[in-house]
Amino acid sequence: MATGKIVQIIGAVVDVEFPQSEVPSVYDALNVTDSKERLVLEVQQQLGGGVVRCIVMGSSDGLRRGVEVVNTGAPISVPVGTKTLGRIMNVLGDAIDERGEIGAEEVYSIHREAPSYEEQSNETALLETGVKVIDLVCPFAKGGKIGLFGGAGVGKTVNMMELINNIALQHSGLSVFAGVGERTREGNDFYFEMQEAGVVNVENPEESKVAMVYGQMNEPPGNRLRVALTGLTMAERFRDEGRDVLLFVDNIYRYTLAGTEVSALLGRMPSAVGYQPTLAEEMGVLQERITSTKQGSITSVQAVYVPADDLTDPSPATTFAHLDATVVLNRNIAAMGLYPAIDPLDSTSRQLDPLVVGQDHYDIARGVQQTLQRYKELKDIIAILGMDELSESDKQVVSRARKIERFLTQPYHVAEVFTGDPGVYVPLKETLRGFKGLLAGEYDDIPEQAFMYCGTIDDAIENAKKL
């Protein structure tokens, strides 16, 4: 194995000098010999003169010039297969749950080619989530890519947890959860919630249904940049075995941000808003690998932080292009106390097509959006002139739209500990029946308060009797 010496350290970026004849390839993993814990560098650039520029997969504190580095001759490789289930791993695939080594028989490189065009599957089957607003206006596809867009504190992680609860627990397949640059507390809560739900079995880890890979907020940018690829590699292995896998990534924005932090240190000129010039390429490399093949499927749910609630920011805007369904969370809806704060006018899905969901579902969803859009237009008139100046038909639209807004809310299982209301899973049939009746005016006599935080339309009728 070729050995080199560290010649320069700038934060997360380290330059290493090797003999001219033994320069490592780009993406090779290098081991630092003089380190108490395992410290790996990943080659990013060859600068000439035998010097390579690397990203540190860990903290560079305590490193010094002259320290010996050994080339492994291969990219970072992580354990895959059933041994990873029920375990928490870091970017290098090392266990961080203090329950011993992973002990997997097989390791895969985290840098892999996306499946070729011939291998990809183009079947469309709907995935029911039990969340009314999602199933109605932005239905998910099995094997699709779903983005949860929202600013700080509007409920991305809670929605993600509810989807894990509703899909992963109902769905008998396996899940991989990649925590990319999020709060350690959330990762910890998730682990214990999964134990309570029986998805993680501590005694017999191989009976678990989820593998967890964490690179949290407090970790250096190298870890946050590569941890999404580590989680994806594990999901790809399950898919290639012929399984249907769920991949949850929280949060894709932090992956971009880690790239931005490293990019300037690597000497690249920043592009718009200070992002790395390779933003679209980095996003494409990750997203193109998240795909379904003829062997199995990967359905991914990705939370996307929206800086300053601006959806035109380069990072969320680049992510949009890769998704099949976008669930947009709106701060104004959250401010009204209507949760989940999903905006039915801004959220989209490629599956909302009469050929996929059926004409009936399509008409109901478009009818709901039409009513809400008309109400949005009338709000200015109401603010200036008041309700009395509206025509009878417009008054009816406003009344129905307000009921629809409230009926789109529902209690979540994962929020039960905060609200005290038991969570509800609403089947698609019930969702469609409720909204069809609302649009047809069957429930015009029920007060709008009755529709707040209920499951099916029958719950709203029961609530009306108590008012």
UniProtKB/Swiss-Prot annotation:
Query: What's a single GO MF annotation on this record?
Result: ATP binding
Question: Gene3D superfamilies, from UniProt?
Answer: 2.40.10.170, Bovine Mitochondrial F1-atpase, Atp Synthase Beta Chain, Chain D, domain 3, P-loop containing nucleotide triphosphate hydrolases
Which GO terms of the cellular component aspect does the record hold?
plasma membrane; proton-transporting ATP synthase complex
EC class name = translocase
What CDD domains does the record point to? ATP-synt_F1_beta_C (cd18110), ATP-synt_F1_beta_N (cd18115), F1-ATPase_beta_CD (cd01133)
Q: Which locations, inside or outside the cell, does it occupy?
A: Cell inner membrane
> Which positions does UniProt annotate for ATP binding?
150-157
Identify its membrane topology class: Peripheral membrane protein
According to its UniProt record, which protein family does this protein belong to? Answer: Belongs to the ATPase alpha/beta chains family.
Role: Produces ATP from ADP in the presence of a proton gradient across the membrane. The catalytic sites are hosted primarily by the beta subunits.
Query: What's the name of the protein?
Result: ATP synthase subunit beta
